[in-house]
Amino acid sequence: MSTQDERQINTEYAVSLLEQLKLFYEQQLFTDIVLIVEGTEFPCHKMVLATCSSYFRAMFMSGLSESKQTHVHLRNVDAATLQIIITYAYTGNLAMNDSTVEQLYETACFLQVEDVLQRCREYLIKKINAENCVRLLSFADLFSCEELKQSAKRMVEHKFTAVYHQDAFMQLSHDLLIDILSSDNLNVEKEETVREAAMLWLEYNTESRSQYLSSVLSQIRIDALSEVTQRAWFQGLPPNDKSVVVQGLYKSMPKFFKPRLGMTKEEMMIFIEASSENPCSLYSSVCYSPQAEKVYKLCSPPADLHKVGTVVTPDNDIYIAGGQVPLKNTKTNHSKTSKLQTAFRTVNCFYWFDAQQNTWFPKTPMLFVRIKPSLVCCEGYIYAIGGDSVGGELNRRTVERYDTEKDEWTMVSPLPCAWQWSAAVVVHDCIYVMTLNLMYCYFPRSDSWVEMAMRQTSRSFASAAAFGDKIFYIGGLHIATNSGIRLPSGTVDGSSVTVEIYDVNKNEWKMAANIPAKRYSDPCVRAVVISNSLCVFMRETHLNERAKYVTYQYDLELDRWSLRQHISERVLWDLGRDFRCTVGKLYPSCLEESPWKPPTYLFSTDGTEEFELDGEMVALPPV
């Protein structure tokens, strides 16, 4: 037999021990210390308190009078909050919500309960939004919580135009204000916004803040202000302030050349779930700048998430929801050939894209799991509509609404019918949902659905976009009468794509000019609004051929489509046919430009190193 001791670990013992300590606490058995807060007594065990709190550990081990006392009075502590911490010490369960978390953090900071502090930090970071980010910035600064402070500051920078009028912004300390106004990452399109924010803060309490006039104004990049603004500003200043203003602005001169991050934004087409150029992954996320004709890499959704819904809000926030993820025990590798062998799980995930960090940030999940839900933003709320789901017909009818300020979902009235697929757009604060030849309108203020005029053609998997008071329903598959067979929309040889327009004021559909397409192509049409113009992004070639993409622009007065841009093969590779396409404003400096790589079809077996691309001969780069 082996002379070594055999070690066996009973994992249930720790749980049993904690439960027994909790029982002793509830029955006040073997307690050796009484905490007194606001007249309320809390009989406890020194050993338990010292285990979770550095404050109590130091108190009981100091050798001072407190270590020998049986009753200890705690000041600057709330009784209800202390009860939460004591419960955590005995059970590991921490109860907190939006109304208690800040007081809980303050008390945990005083008592030095690091586990509670970390849980509170994580909770607050997850809850940061435009309404509370300035207040949480001051809160984090007060308690020297750097992780929370940086997260709150990023949200202040991102939502600057929405937060600088808030009372919390007016209450900012001078140092925090300078830290914000000096930031290169402010999401502002005009320096006038920064100037206005600075002046509002100074004028909030002129008497006490006049001493900061020079230091605050030195953060304004005057060279970025229009001449009209500069002239009007100086003319409106009191005579005694003009010299101070000039002195303050002079200090900002070295920063004149540096634009704020928001001034560098470019409108881009965002492709989620595009076929990856990387053989080791199934999908990729990229964005294309029509102005610069460049492609940038986006961080792909976590955990190989795909079949999601996507939306870009009027405030330029990007969200994805739902979808599927591979089951870990069935996914053998990441290669494309294993895709059919992989089992998937439908999820209710919900993510916000942090454009500055180029990363997806998890938010509160939806109430239902969904595959390819239709996402829209209406009156400040995000709606997740229908989508395929494991719940069958009932789940396909469900609709839920997300409150961006509260970070929570609530159910609203369900769809009148259940569909596996639908398209949704927003016009005049109403949501229009379309599929086949049907359309329903949702009125948020009355939480009701109304059936609208039917389309002339029955099509599924079409692309829809709202432009002004019109809705465009483009492409898709025709549903043949009686047989149910799906055929590509447009002409028989695929040389055009069907377009229908809905007038929301007249409640009527009409046929519009078809979009020209190459014969026998597989266009994979996506309708988008770019630079205040209705456009379609589409493929010119069949899926079995080399991918070539173009954008067409619609002229509403002439009812005509014209070629807007031919996208070089060197820029976009084959995106497949299942990609999501939206339009949003992103920061090129925060993205990685995607270098062009010759596709595998360009390499010939005879060793040829030159080929034709975009109408010209190109030599392969050296290996």
From Swiss-Prot:
InterPro entries: BACK (IPR011705), BTB-kelch_protein (IPR017096), BTB/POZ_dom (IPR000210), BTB_POZ_KBTBD2 (IPR030586), KBTBD2_BACK (IPR047074), Kelch-typ_b-propeller (IPR015915), Kelch_1 (IPR006652), SKP1/BTB/POZ_sf (IPR011333). Pathway: Protein modification; protein ubiquitination. One of its GO terms (molecular function) is ubiquitin-like ligase-substrate adaptor activity. Kelch repeats lie at residues 317-380, 381-429, 431-469, 470-529, 535-581. It comes from the Eukaryota. Residues 133-229 form the BACK domain. CDD domains: BACK_KBTBD2 (cd18479), BTB_POZ_KBTBD2_BKLHD1 (cd18270). Residues 31-98 form the BTB domain. Keywords: Kelch repeat, Phosphoprotein, Repeat, Ubl conjugation pathway. One of its GO terms (cellular component) is cytoplasm. The modification Phosphoserine is found at S300. GO terms for biological process: gene expression; glucose metabolic process; lipid metabolic process; phosphatidylinositol 3-kinase/protein kinase B signal transduction; proteasome-mediated ubiquitin-dependent protein catabolic process; protein K48-linked ubiquitination; regulation of cellular response to insulin stimulus; response to insulin. Recognizes the BCR (BTB-CUL3-RBX1) E3 ubiquitin ligase complex substrate, PIK3R1, through the 4 tandem C-terminal Kelch domains. Component of the BCR(KBTBD2) E3 ubiquitin ligase complex, at least composed of CUL3, KBTBD2 and RBX1. Interacts (via the BTB domain) with CUL3. Substrate-specific adapter of a BCR (BTB-CUL3-RBX1) E3 ubiquitin ligase complex that acts as a regulator of the insulin signaling pathway, modulating insulin sensitivity by limiting PIK3R1/p85alpha abundance in adipocytes. Targets PIK3R1, the regulatory subunit of phosphatidylinositol 3-kinase (PI3K), for 'Lys-48'-linked polyubiquitination and proteasome-mediated degradation. This is Kelch repeat and BTB domain-containing protein 2.
